[in-house]
Amino acid sequence: MLFFEIIKAIIFGIVEGITEWLPISSTGHLILVEEFIHFNNANAAFTNMFNVVIQLGAILAVVVIYFDRLNPFKSGKTAREVQITWQLWAKVILSALPAAVIGLIFDDWLDAHFQNFFSVALMLILYGIAFIYVERRHQGVEPQVTHLVSLPYKTAFFIGLFQVLSLIPGTSRSGATILGGILLGTSRQVATEFTFFLGIPIMFGASLVKVLKFIVSGTILTGSQLFILLVAMLVAFAVSLYVIRFLTDYVKNHDFTFFGKYRIGLGILLLFYGLMKVLFG
């Protein structure tokens, strides 16, 4: 029944809206959810496309929240403010290039070799440990970059190199870029905010690639599948509006140690579940 499919789409949208922005891997959570919730008559092509395209809802929340800052054509902006906005976009595009190029070349290969329980679990655990280590190492260390406007182009580019690591499922795009930002001397606030903006070209691009591959495969998107996709995107958008604001406030007074511990716990859970599947089917 369509009603139950809508409920499933809502669940996926909630999971995506929460996990896309927190550094805990949306892929890891979606893989776990997919083990228990399946769309009726959904083939692998639709599922693969669905898991990426619902990110559009999440990224639209960033555009809505930060529209004034991201819009260089907003009336009332001074010449300096317009310049700052264009510089921000230049840094975002520069930072997005490495992941865009590597992703286009190796997308299918990465999905084929790393889209599984054990790879995702390993990445969850490794980066969980990394977060805890980096936060302890940086206790009492004053960040060099405390405002996004002063983020150097070189630092933005190197944050983009960290984003390449997130092409391996389970890493977390936000996790990789936030971790990279902290290691490169930015404050948690700057790293988090730049991560939001960096998601715009990357997630729009990734969604476009998946849609094109879906079309090229010759698979037909049914009306009910399109409706389910739109529902999930809308829910992801609504949830993201809250999560983005939550994380922005959270990092003002907290570090990412909790998320590191959470990642380790989830990774162990996925490893155990994956092992049980191998042993008992």
UniProtKB/Swiss-Prot annotation:
EC supergroup of this enzyme: hydrolase
UniProt KW keywords:
Antibiotic resistance, Cell membrane, Cell shape, Cell wall biogenesis/degradation, Hydrolase, Membrane, Peptidoglycan synthesis, Transmembrane, Transmembrane helix
| Annotated source species | Streptococcus mutans serotype c (strain ATCC 700610 / UA159)
Q: For this UniProt entry, which segments traverse the membrane?
A: 45-65, 86-106, 114-134, 148-168, 196-216, 224-244, 256-276
The protein depicted here goes by the name Undecaprenyl-diphosphatase
Its Enzyme Commission number?
3.6.1.27
Q: Which domain of life is it from?
A: Bacteria
Question: Where does it live in the cell?
Answer: Cell membrane
- Leftover remarks: Bacitracin is thought to be involved in the inhibition of peptidoglycan synthesis by sequestering undecaprenyl diphosphate, thereby reducing the pool of lipid carrier available.
* Function of the molecule: Catalyzes the dephosphorylation of undecaprenyl diphosphate (UPP). Confers resistance to bacitracin.
Q: Which GO terms describe its biological process?
A: cell wall organization; peptidoglycan biosynthetic process; regulation of cell shape; response to antibiotic
Q: What is its main location?
A: membrane
Q: What are the annotated GO cellular component locations?
A: plasma membrane
Q: Would you identify the family this protein belongs to, as annotated?
A: Belongs to the UppP family.
Instruction: Name the membrane topology term.
Output: Multi-pass membrane protein
Q: Which reaction does it catalyse?
A: di-trans,octa-cis-undecaprenyl diphosphate + H2O = di-trans,octa-cis-undecaprenyl phosphate + phosphate + H(+)
Q: What InterPro entries does the entry give?
A: UppP
The GO molecular function terms of this record are: undecaprenyl-diphosphatase activity
Q: What does the record give as the organism's lineage?
A: Bacteria, Bacillati, Bacillota, Bacilli, Lactobacillales
